[in-house]
Amino acid sequence: MNAMKILSGILLAALVLGCGGCAGAPEEPVSTLLFAPGDGGSKYYRIPALVTADDGSLVAVADRRLESMGDLPNKIDLVARRSTDGGRTWSSVIPIAEHRGDCGYGDAALVSDARSGELLCIFASGRGLWESTPEAPIDINICRSGDFGQTWSAPECITPQLWGAACANPLSRGWYGAFAASGRALQLRDGTLLFVVAARTGRAAPPLVNYVCMSEDGGRSWRLLPTPVDMNGDEAKLVERADGSWLMSIRNPAKGRRKYALSADRGATWSEPQRWEDMPSPACNGDIVRYTLRVEGARRNRMLHSIPLDSVERRNVSVLLSYDEGCTWPVRRSVWSGDAGYSSLTVLPDGDIGLLTEVGNWERGFEIYFTRLTPEWLTRGEDDGR
């Protein structure tokens, strides 16, 4: 009888421990389809951009490419969907900028201004990059939202502040065109707003050159920083390091490995671009964002990067984690193992991670999914992100 009680106790303890282990397993990522071919009468969708608004809501933006999968000049609208519950449910489609005739709008970069609470959407319009000239350039515009993405202002053209024949800056007056890298723009801790353009500085096609655009008044006025970052770059993103220096992650047109450069003097000078040997990349856009900072109460400084981790093909979109301010990326997990391209990242108010990804390829088209994942899942239970 006593032996039976002991055996029953052992079995019960084993069951309790087993259930406890199951309960402690990291939550698996959950993906939601937000934009798909055929939605809204559009044949195609591309170019994800994602941001967390000041009230904690999520805003996901995409190009609604009505007739062609190609870039500008085409009939393209910028559209958004919002979530107020961490990405579990989403609003109906919200227009940001809709094409007029053959003038389309595309390639959105998003940033939330912590000073004003406004959302800024920065994007291209009109002529395509390769059709652009100094006299008739591809335009860059801003739309603003003062209600966390529910409504948006009319597009404001800021091209004359930055490039083209109407610009007073002798450096960029003769440029043939430029566009902001889609995904995330950046607000520094002092409130300064930044985004990176890929500039076509002469009549010839590539290479493109990366330059930083800066605003110190909430995006009301902009200026071009004079130092080129990469003379053979493309879509590039910025993040502020813990020491205040800037790290730029650069699409490598040669494929192989992602490139980066550093500035310790607010963009006045830049290091020579180097390759992240631990980050293969197939000449594709991705995102880099700050995750946590020790000065804000976290145990560690952390950055996140999303990119297709493949040196040749656009597939295997993964999220990577750095503990040394972007020097190395030792933690990585694949979110979309098949064909997938551009992606955008944001941090949710509870510390979970949001990823917006175009899933598919040029043959069958792209669907755009939002994925919510936890730091525990990303690190296989090693880090809770606090």
Which ranges hold each PLM region?
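Asp-box/BNR beta-propeller blade signature and adjacent active/binding-site loops
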Residues: 22-386
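Positively charged n-region of N-terminal signal peptides that target proteins for export
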Residues: 1-6
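Bacterial N-terminal signal peptides
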Residues: 8-18
